[in-house]
Amino acid sequence: MPPQQGDPAFPGRCEAPPVPPRRERGVRGPGAPGGRGRAGGPEGHGVKCVLVGDGAVGKTSLVVSYTTNGYPTEYIPTAFDNFSAVVSVDGRPVKLQLCDTAGQDEFDKLRPLCYTNADIFLLCFSVVGPSSFQNVSEKWVPEIRCHCPKAPIILVGTQSDLREDVKVLIELDKCKEKPVPEEAARLCAEEIKATSYIECSALTQKNLKEVFDAAIVAGIQYSDSQQQPKKSKSRTPDKMKTLSKSWWKKYCCFV
């Protein structure tokens, strides 16, 4: 299937909303993808994507906007929630599991249960929440690396639509604060060795699809690398580079 508007093959055209997948609200425990082993099981490839970050930075809004094309009208703190869909990547089915976690301190002991078999982390902070950005390196990276030393991380700046919001800027100014500069966020991504840094908005859906496209590709690469025989490890980088280009172009539909 040819690339669609909003695909990485079309730089600067990431505003298009994704095609909504089927959604299954998880009813099992925080770490349960529906069975044993990695997400997807033996019948097909699977990617388990875990969203982490401070409370109220918009993690749930990202998931809801991506999976339903809707937007939550009120803030309800998340405990733990699972969403899943089957996506077509390079002509093969991939089960995408999204684990939305609670950022509040009272869930610090429970939250790591969601990290089991994680293929990719979306580490979220609000671009208009300096304290949430500070916690990226002070709290979240150490927590992730304690439980998943090698899993890739994508740093995500949420609520980008509020960067120029006058009311938000006034409130920040009262506290002698400013929005997080994009340059500072990119530098942070380099320091924590994140796969990439992407700013997005769940409300306008700008760069929203790009965030989850990147998560799927990075998650598949990581999952494959964990299963690669050691003897073929030296050939992995070139092979994955070729495949990732194909996936970026062809990942554009849900089934």
From Swiss-Prot:
Pfam families: Ras. One of its GO terms (molecular function) is metal ion binding. SUPFAM superfamilies: P-loop containing nucleoside triphosphate hydrolases. Binds to and activates protein kinase PAK1. Plays a role in the regulation of cell morphology, cytoskeletal organization and focal adhesion assembly during cell migration. Also stimulates quiescent cells to reenter the cell cycle. Has no detectable GTPase activity but its high intrinsic guanine nucleotide exchange activity suggests it is constitutively GTP-bound. Tyrosine phosphorylated by SRC in response to PTK2B/PYK2 activation. Ubiquitinated. 'Lys-48'-linked ubiquitination at Lys-174 and Lys-245 by the ECS(RAB40A) complex leading to its degradation. It comes from Bos taurus (Bovine). There is a cross-link at K174, K245 (Glycyl lysine isopeptide (Lys-Gly) (interchain with G-Cter in ubiquitin)). It is a lipid-anchor. Keywords: Cell junction, Cell membrane, Cell projection, Golgi apparatus, GTP-binding, Isopeptide bond, Lipoprotein, Magnesium, Membrane, Metal-binding, Nucleotide-binding, Palmitate, Phosphoprotein, Ubl conjugation. It is found in: Cell membrane; Golgi apparatus membrane; Cell junction, Focal adhesion; Cell projection, Podosome. InterPro entries: P-loop_NTPase, Small_GTP-bd, Small_GTPase, Small_GTPase_Rho. GO terms for biological process: actin filament organization; cytoskeleton organization; endocytosis; establishment of cell polarity; G1/S transition of mitotic cell cycle; Rac protein signal transduction; regulation of cell shape; signal transduction. Belongs to the small GTPase superfamily. Rho family. This is Rho-related GTP-binding protein RhoU.
